[in-house]
Amino acid sequence: ARLEPFDSYWQAPKDVEGGFKAFTAYYKANYLPHLPEDREARILVVSCGPGYLLNALAEAGYRNVVGIDSDPSKAAVGQKRGLACEVAEAFPYLEHHRGEYDVIIPEQELNHLTIDETIEFLRLCHDALKPGGRVIVYAMNGANPFVGSENLSHNIDHFYNVTEYSLTQLLQLGGFTDVRPFALKLYVFWKNPLNYVGLAVTSLLELAMRAIFMLYGKKVRVLSKKVGAVARKGA
């Protein structure tokens, strides 16, 4: 991944500071339900960028969180806000921190890596976790017929799409068990009236798509633009 490096977060808006509020709402809706209740859990955020997820975790009371990003200018934004953003590349960092974390979360989509790189990355995450630890990942969802092809073709650093099934396969190849895919929610901004319109329209479309898939003998549960998964390392 050269145009959008996997270990550097690229999705920050032009108003980087303004992004903290929006991304915090997104992360709280999508990630907090999958985190341990223990606020002292050791959490590593890979490709943390300016620290949006770190900020959301801090607001939720998690006190033992560190983020890494390969771009010093992005990490500096979080550092100025008192967030534990370090400048580091993902693969060598994980190699030198084995068995240290309860949770690892990459903020970048897995599909910015090739299949082989993804499996290697997941194995490194597996080794960096404590027994019973978990990883929370996401990638572009190829099961959605409206955006799946565009997701893959959007830039040359998107090497593949996944479905809930193939994302599970990748995590299993990385050594993980108890893989639980979930839909990443886009419409979580409840003060915006258009949020409700988008939620209603996409919910109806996904219901129709599920029915069509059933006619073809396919049982597809996750049809959101992006599909996430939480997976555990054996105890």
Predicted segments with their positions:
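Conserved N-terminal segment of class I S-adenosyl-L-methionine
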Residues: 1-107, 116-123, 184, 224-227
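A short His-aromatic
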Residues: 111-113
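Short, glycine-/aromatic-enriched active-site segment of Class I SAM-dependent methyltransferases
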Residues: 137-160
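Short glycine-dipeptide loop
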Residues: 129-135
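Short acidic/His/Gly/Ser-rich catalytic and metal-binding motifs that mark active-site loops
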Residues: 54, 144-148, 190-191
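Short alpha-helix
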Residues: 159-175
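A C-terminal cap/extension of S-adenosyl-L-methionine-dependent methyltransferases
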Residues: 169, 180-235
